[in-house]
Design a protein with these regions (language model features):
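A short beta-loop-alpha structural element at the N-terminal edge
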Residues: 3-17
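Helix-loop element at the rim of GNAT/NAT acetyltransferase active sites that forms part
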Residues: 6, 18-35
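Acetyl-CoA-dependent GNAT
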Residues: 9-10, 23, 36-95, 107
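Active-site acidic-Proline motif in GNAT/NAT acetyltransferases
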Residues: 91-96, 100, 128-129
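Conserved acetyl-CoA pyrophosphate-binding loop and the N-cap/start of the following alpha-helix
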Residues: 97, 101-109
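Conserved short alpha-helix immediately C-terminal to the canonical SAM/SAH-binding motif I
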Residues: 106, 130-133
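Conserved GNAT acetyl-CoA-binding A-motif
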Residues: 107, 114-125
């Protein structure tokens, strides 16, 4: 059974490992395989979570099965008065767990947080060829607003 919860700070290393696994499992996350390990640390991630999520600015939820973190969704709220009503979304689900409704549940829970926190615009970036993600986003009400050519180079 999948359980959805806030990330407990004592699970930060498990979350770090999930992020690194997602980086190697798919070509569609921002980091190249092993790039995250070279550019940041578990401690930096912990500070980010403490400063932004635990303080209530951002949303972060994980999905677990048998105590293993299998996916997450994060919404990073705008930091200025003019964009404080927006949040940028990142979602990652291990390949084995895709197509099981985890993404839809994440978005339903995110919508509740957004309404409670006066977020009126949720946004994200997806590669044109990532049809699985595009279908999930469109199913959850997202619309394509434009194409950013040459914004990412995937090796």
């Amino acid at each position: 059974m999948i359980i959805y919860s806030k990330l407990e700070i004592n699970r930060i290393k498990d979350f770090w490992e999930l992020l690194n696994r997602l980086d190697t499992e798919t070509d569609y996350m921002m980091y190249e395989p092993n790039e995250r390990k070279a550019k940041t640390t578990v401690q930096e991630l912990k500070l980010d979570i403490q400063d932004n999520v635990i303080q209530g600015f951002d949303f972060l939820q994980v999905a677990t099965e048998n105590d293993k973190i299998v996916g997450y969704i994060r919404a990073e709220r705008g930091k200025f008065e003019r964009n404080f009503h927006t949040a940028y979304i990142v979602i990652g689900i291990l390949k084995k767990y895709r197509g099981k409704g985890i993404g839809t549940t994440f978005f339903n829970n995110l919508d509740l947080w957004a309404k409670t926190n006066n977020i009126v615009r949720l946004e994200l970036t997806v590669e044109c060829c990532n049809n699985t993600a595009k279908n999930l986003y469109e199913k959850n009400g997202f619309k394509i607003e434009g194409i950013r050519k040459k914004s990412m180079f995937v090796a």
